[in-house]
Design a protein with these regions (language model features):
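Eukaryote-biased recognition of intrinsically disordered, low-complexity regulatory segments
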Residues: 4-27
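Short strand-turn-strand beta-turns centered on an Asx-Gly dipeptide
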Residues: 12, 29, 74-76
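Short, contiguous acidic and Ser/Thr-rich linear segments
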Residues: 24-36
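Ferredoxin-type iron-sulfur electron-transfer modules in oxidoreductases and energy-metabolism complexes
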Residues: 35-54, 101-251
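Long, hydrophobic/aromatic-enriched structural stretches that serve as scaffold segments
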Residues: 53-54, 69-73
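Short, structured protein-protein interaction patches enriched in aromatics and acidic/basic residues
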Residues: 57-69
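Glycine-rich phosphate/adenylate-binding loop and adjacent beta-alpha elements
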Residues: 74-98, 103
Length: 251
């Protein structure tokens, strides 16, 4: 059975996008080790509300590692020290009694702070709107086996599609680049027959939108790959670069 721990929590508080933020310190006592990180924040918020304060604003939805909403920078790592897991999948047993835990929002020009730990990640939606889809005529769908796809290609596309768009890659990158996200979303479509028709347009449009929204350039430090909760490979970035170069040569 996991032991209870007590620790110091330093949380970034900021009232709005243009307000000046600062860390506030809270003492957490006897938190069970099997408490998830977000449940711990729920406990803290209940204490703050009972004391008449403003609860900490943070993003969450499914709490199952699927939606990508729980975007917290914990002790210098996107989603915390756990590998291959989102914030909501991390439990307090990963920390020691007496630890100091620092919690911040994603730090990137592409993800401005809304309030406290919540950031605006709508830039990702805009990138997807630029080309993260396959244009089709409406009508009855084809049978699943109508277009044969080799297993190795299907596996690569599925691995790329595992990206949940959380933004950890941007938070981890010293340049604030969204290349891992963009390359995963381009790859999951460009690898498949249905996506190849628009492959050139997709690569150019999504990269152009990424640059327009203020994300930085990729310099291959691989921090994004190391911190990605879904273990997305930077081989997708190499594929996107190839697709982009080929597309520009065809212009």
């Amino acid at each position: 059975m996991d032991k209870n721990i007590s620790f110091t929590l330093k949380v970034w508080r900021q009232k709005g996008p243009k307000a000046k933020g600062a860390f506030e310190t809270y003492q957490m006592k006897d938190i069970p080790g099997d408490t998830s990180f977000l449940e711990m924040l729920d406990i803290l918020n209940e204490q703050i509300i009972n004391d008449g304060g403003e609860p900490i604003v943070f993003d969450h939805d499914c709490r199952e590692g699927i939606c990508g909403m729980c975007s917290l920078y914990i002790n210098g790592h996107p989603h915390g020290p756990a590998t291959g897991a989102t914030t909501c999948q991390m439990y307090m047993r990963r920390f020691k009694d007496g630890d100091t835990i620092t919690v911040e929002p994603w730090g990137s020009a592409g993800f401005p702070v809304i309030r406290d730990l919540m950031v605006d990640r709508s830039a990702y939606d805009k990138i997807m709107q630029a080309g993260g889809y396959v244009s089709v005529n409406t009508g009855a769908p084809q049978d699943a086996n109508a277009i044969l796809i080799s297993k190795d290609i299907a596996d690569e596309a599925m691995d790329a599609a595992a990206c949940i768009g959380c933004g950890a890659c941007v938070a981890a990158c010293k340049n604030g680049s969204a290349m891992l996200f963009v390359s995963a979303k381009v790859s999951q479509l460009n690898l498949l027959p249905q996506g190849k028709v628009e492959a050139a347009r997709r690569a150019k449009a999504m990269l152009s939108k990424m640059d327009e929204l203020g994300f930085g350039n990729c310099t291959n430090t691989r921090a994004c790959e190391a911190e990605c909760p879904k273990n997305i490979s930077i081989s997708n970035i190499a594929r996107l670069n190839r697709d982009f170069i080929i597309a520009k040569l065809k212009d």
